[in-house]
């Protein structure tokens, strides 16, 4: 059963997207500065329907998630794994936790991610949640000014790397399965 004390405590979320690593992960580093951080990964059921998804992709994803979880355990944490529509997962999390900030790294945006992020922006704003997206590639995805590309790239490539997260207080959502996609084929996931 869900514990109502979580509606009193303030939480941040570290949303792992394609950045399934501990070291040199600015979003994870920044999220670790806040108490009560919920590290999550969402396997979006609509994403599985895209033509770019395959058994190879799911196997790689599973291996990466297992490795990430092992590394989070070394920090006294655990990855909270959800399977469903990303929008619905966040709505459920907002009902269970008093979320103040969501941290993630930017992702390259195909049509699926453009629409997803647009819908999530609306949801996050309506819930008064700040979404902090860090740049993990040095590529400008927003506010692109061609004359500034070189300078911005030099600034990014000369910036410091981020080490292990600090002061981590990672939370476990007892309602999520924490079972990864191991031994499931692509056909079973669709």
For the regions a protein language model found, what residue spans apply to each?
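Active-site "lid/cap" and pocket-lining segments within catalytic core domains
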Residues: 9-190
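Short, Lys/Arg-enriched N-terminal segments with co-localized hydrophobic residues
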Residues: 1-8
């Amino acid at each position: 059963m869900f514990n109502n004390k979580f509606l009193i405590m303030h939480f941040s979320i570290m949303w792992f997207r394609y950045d399934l690593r501990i070291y040199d992960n600015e979003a994870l580093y920044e999220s670790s500065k806040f108490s009560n951080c919920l590290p999550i990964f969402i396997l979006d059921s609509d994403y599985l329907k895209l033509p770019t998804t395959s058994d190879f992709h799911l196997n790689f994803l599973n291996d990466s998630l297992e490795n990430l979880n092992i590394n989070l355990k070394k920090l006294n944490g655990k990855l909270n794994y959800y399977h469903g529509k990303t929008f619905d997962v966040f709505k459920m999390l907002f009902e269970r936790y008093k979320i103040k900030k969501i941290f993630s790294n930017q992702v390259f945006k195909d049509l699926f991610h453009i629409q997803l992020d647009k819908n999530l922006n609306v949801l996050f704003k309506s819930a008064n949640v700040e979404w902090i997206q860090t740049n993990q590639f040095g590529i400008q995805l927003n506010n692109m000014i061609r004359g500034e590309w070189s300078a911005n790239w030099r600034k990014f490539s000369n910036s410091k790397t981020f080490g292990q997260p600090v002061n981590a207080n990672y939370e476990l959502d007892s309602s999520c399965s924490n079972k990864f996609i191991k031994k499931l084929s692509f056909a079973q996931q669709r």
